[in-house]
Amino acid sequence: MSEKTDLSELRRGTELVKRGFARMQKGGVIMDVVDAEQARIAEDAGAVAVMALESVPADIRKRGGVARMPDPDIVPEIIDEVSIPAMGKSRIGHTKEAEILESLGVDMIDESEVLTPADDRYHIDKRHFTAPFVCGARNLQEALRRIDEGAAMIRTKGEAGTGDVNQAVHHQRNIKSSIRELVGKSYEERERWARDHEAPAELVHETAEMGRLPVVNFAAGGIATPADAALMMHHGCDGIFVGSGVFGAENPRAMGRAIVEAVNNWDDPDELAQIASNPGKGMKGEANADLSEGEKLQTRGV
């Protein structure tokens, strides 16, 4: 006699379900929001999901201090305001912030380097949560470590809050280049690569056989214009996270719509030219080259 299937387990919490939810966001734009009003603007602009946080990354940079999870009073307001999925950011290694966000009902948790890390050595063990996680990565080995911990989605770290897409491009190219390298290696060479890069061997082999990451891979960090979003899609990303680029712009509604349209038409230069002329002035931005090592967020959590 076959074992009885637990339908509640199938609906939520399994690795298959968590990765499936992440795949449902593919081809879309996820926007950072700090309150219900911004969440409404994001949904009206065509976002596939919103990400709740205390402040957008550009404001976190300006303000300094300790950046934490969003106010627990604000999260339910954001969830109730929109019909699209609502996500929330937690600090790296802060298991309790993640548990609170899950209890509040968020659809996904971003263990984010944008917030002040709670643990300099360890990330959250994401396998035991029912909510899926997204994590940032600068290269393939970081991405595979996060997937091994239970991440259902990877995103480039980029350099959040700068409006400079340079590092997001760099990180995406790093990941794709390493995957191409692995595809051409023998079993023994992949095992050696896994040891040398402190990456889980099983995932190294799986990635090489698939020719891509085992989970969806979004772009994030410094995306500030429709052209930036289209560029990251050109480089093979599955979708886009954007925060300061929308609500730091002169006209957030128009910029949000334009970025969504750019993702939908990333391979049509004529359409992109029309889209890029509509949203008005973007955020001011700060060049990555001007940042000191201490000002870089991407180095948090390896």
Curated annotation (Swiss-Prot):
CDD domains: pdxS. This is Pyridoxal 5'-phosphate synthase subunit PdxS. GO terms for biological process: amino acid metabolic process; pyridoxal phosphate biosynthetic process; pyridoxine biosynthetic process. The gene is pdxS. Pathway: Cofactor biosynthesis; pyridoxal 5'-phosphate biosynthesis. The active site is at K89. Its EC number is 4.3.3.6. It comes from Haloquadratum walsbyi (strain DSM 16790 / HBSQ001). Residues 293-302 have a biased composition (Basic and acidic residues). It is an enzyme of class 4 (lyase).
